[in-house]
């Protein structure tokens, strides 16, 4: 079940934060364009970037009501007023004036919200039923997995928590998504009528192929609605592409909207660093994604809170380390930096040189706790000890986490 998926994730990150680390998220309008190109039905609509365009679209279409949606990389838009049903051009213009170019704050994004650069206006659909449908990578079962529920329009995490019996999870064999028994199980579980069943079978086939062909890590249609005319329509969609596969999809690289990311994330990206901003007070610099998340877990277990995920990679230079530290201290919430390096490919003395250079160049005032292990570790420790800077050596990862937490907590 989907509950097992989220429970397998390391304690330092929630599901949305983990997705951010490895994925390129798309806007709803971008995801729907891809769905439509794959012959999956979506509501007719238009992207607008001005009140004039909104006014023209509403007046040119004969529908009595429209759904107007602010486009940001976060859920909870409806609760914050960012999704609304309108019935006139005047309402459309008022919505655009209120949100376009402004930041929309929801319970899923940062305190300052995210900028609304585009607004989607669509025809409304007369809905008979709302379903939940998604395809994800389930690391527990090591398989592409279809997740569905009869409780569409709700957050799947809430359904999993409160009504897990309403969720069905089906693992797919590679290149064999159309297992007849699985299809029958899903259709029966969702109680889909005979008129809609052929459409649903087609949706399974099309969406699976879309997922595989585009190297997606998430395809979520919520709600997937059955209209009063028995049409199956994707009313809303979230889509994330595995950014490690972008070299195969040059057409997708331009879809990344950097305005939706933390400015430090953009800076780190162009420096070749894997960085995700979080909301804690302990900056983390680690080599290797697995070690980085383990470090963050230990910080949490020690009573602290990580301010970021940062993997400098295995081939970082002194300049890379210096750049990484500058990005870390640009976060005003950071009270201490924890550097945890296992020197295999990367040499500990190079890391130490980068730390010392960054502290001297930028004038870093906050303490830096450093745990080094591996190639040239003694040379690295010697460099740090001789620097006479505010750098605290740690003998182990546990020792480093405890020292960082004590400093962050003012002890």
Name every feature range the model reports, one short phrase each:
Residues 348:
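Active-site-adjacent beta->alpha loops and helix N-cap segments on the catalytic face
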Residues 22-220, 225-339, 360, 373-387, ...:
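ATP-dependent carboxylate/acyl-activation modules
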Residues 367-373:
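Short internal beta-strands
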Residues 323-325, 351-356:
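Charged helix-capping and loop-helix junction motifs
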Residues 7-23:
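Short, Lys/Arg-enriched N-terminal segments with co-localized hydrophobic residues
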Residues 65, 365-367:
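Proline-centered loop/turn at the N-terminus of a beta-strand
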Residues 344:
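Catalytic core of bacterial c-di-GMP phosphodiesterases, primarily the EAL and HD-GYP domains
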């Amino acid at each position: 079940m989907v509950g097992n998926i989220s429970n397998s994730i390391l304690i330092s990150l929630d599901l949305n934060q983990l997705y951010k680390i490895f994925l390129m998220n798309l806007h709803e309008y971008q995801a729907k364009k891809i769905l439509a190109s794959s012959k999956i039905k979506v509501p007719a609509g238009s992207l607008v970037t001005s009140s004039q365009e909104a006014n023209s679209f509403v007046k040119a279409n004969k529908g009595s009501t429209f759904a107007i949606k602010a486009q940001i990389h976060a859920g909870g838009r409806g609760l914050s007023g960012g999704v609304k049903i309108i019935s006139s051009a005047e309402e459309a213009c008022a919505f655009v004036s209120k949100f376009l170019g402004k930041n929309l704050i929801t319970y899923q994004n940062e305190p300052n919200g995210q900028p609304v650069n585009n607004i989607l206006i669509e025809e409304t659909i007369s809905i008979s039923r709302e379903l939940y449908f998604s395809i994800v990578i389930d690391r527990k079962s090591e398989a592409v997995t279809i997740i569905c529920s009869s409780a569409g329009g709700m957050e799947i995490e809430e359904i999993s928590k409160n009504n897990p019996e309403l969720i069905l999870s089906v693992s797919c064999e590679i290149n064999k998504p159309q297992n007849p028994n699985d299809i029958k199980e899903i259709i029966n579980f969702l109680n889909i009528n005979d008129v809609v069943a052929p459409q649903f079978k087609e949706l399974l086939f099309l969406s699976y192929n879309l997922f595989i062909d585009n190297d997606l890590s998430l395809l979520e249609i919520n709600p997937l609605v059955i209209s009063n005319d028995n049409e199956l329509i994707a009313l809303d969609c979230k889509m994330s592409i595995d950014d490690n596969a972008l070299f195969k999809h040059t057409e997708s690289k331009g879809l990344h909207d950097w305005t939706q990311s933390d400015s430090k994330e953009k800076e780190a990206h162009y420096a070749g660093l894997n960085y995700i901003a979080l909301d804690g007070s302990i900056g983390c610099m680690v080599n290797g994604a697995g070690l980085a998340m383990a470090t963050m877990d230990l910080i949490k277990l020690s009573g602290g809170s990580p301010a970021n995920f940062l993997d400098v990679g295995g081939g970082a230079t002194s300049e890379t380390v210096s750049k990484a530290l500058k990005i870390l201290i640009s976060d005003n919430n950071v009270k201490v930096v924890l550097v945890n390096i296992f020197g295999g490919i990367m040499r500990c003395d190079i890391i130490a040189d980068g730390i010392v250079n960054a502290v001297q160049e930028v004038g870093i005032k906050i303490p830096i706790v450093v745990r080094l292990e591996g190639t040239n570790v003694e040379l690295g420790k010697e460099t740090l000890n001789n620097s006479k800077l505010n750098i605290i050596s740690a003998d182990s990862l546990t020792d480093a986490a405890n020292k960082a937490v004590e400093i962050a907590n003012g002890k």
